[in-house]
Amino acid sequence: MGVGKRIYRGEARKMILVRNIRLELGDSADALRDKAASELGIAPREIKELKIKKRSLDARKKSDIHWLYSVSVSVRNEEKTLKRAKSRNVCEYEEFEYQIPQIKSAERPVVIGFGPAGMFAALVLSRAGLRPIVIERGCDVDTRMERVEAFRSGGELDPECNVQFGEGGAGTFSDGKLNTGIKDKRISWMLEQFHRHGAPEEILYDGKPHIGTDILTGIVRSIRGEIISLGGEIRFNSKLTGIKTEGGAVTGIEVTGKNGAYALPCRCLILAIGHSARDTFEMLNGLGVPMEPKAFSMGVRIEHKQADIDLAQYGAVYPSLPAADYSLTQESDTEFTLKTVNNDQWSCLTKKVN
């Protein structure tokens, strides 16, 4: 297996997209299929498959709060149905499906870091039959939870196992919010893997997908279990300390683990080291690896009573609605931007780095 070789392939499945389907707060689940069929000009029974692609809450008018859905549907004759549909909310749609082929190779790829990037890299490699080895400087999520709680209770900081380092990455303790782009076709696949391992179905279509730390730790544990069941290996409390090269190509790495330092041969190396492994950055910089600074945020947490935010956003308290949120952004002529961030209500000064 050569470095950089794509180990997945995908194919587009033709479906129909129906957008801007309005549901009232008290509508039943069957109403979505009925209204999608109405937009298409067909009977509900003619829809073979319906998948929610996006759901958002329109609360701009507090007297008229409602849900807006986009769904993909499969019918017996898509082309005929599209021609017959008169609604502007109906269009042709391609559902992208990934297929991970099996690859035969005696070489085992090495992944450094077991945060989101490293975890999904190892998951795909495992499903391809490549039995990756993961090197993670922190500890497993259960031990990590104990160390974090001990620190928050006034205990001692473990520099290698804390809210920044360990299985699941820094986001494991940030309430499980999922930040993704909107254009990459791989996003839906990744959300599907979270759902497959225990995340609620709503993350597949909500505009601001959210899991929660209490659920996320179990998901992380489940993904690790699948990787191991497919022949992968996760080495916790193990730190990358050096990279060996020959002729401009990686030939191996140096690792310091619980039982001391050792060398590990490898020709395929994935660095998923996150944003806080500064000693690793220094080592990579010494090897001449190109890198550049990234903008960062710093700030304080603003706490409100959830009932006050619900009242301000919805005009009343609706038990059937999710917790309301808000965001504010203030641009300035300086190099800083002030903004709040989703439900956590973090007020951040973001510095622009040239």
Which stretches of residues belong to each language-model region?
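Residues forming the flavin
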Residues: 4, 12-67, 71-354
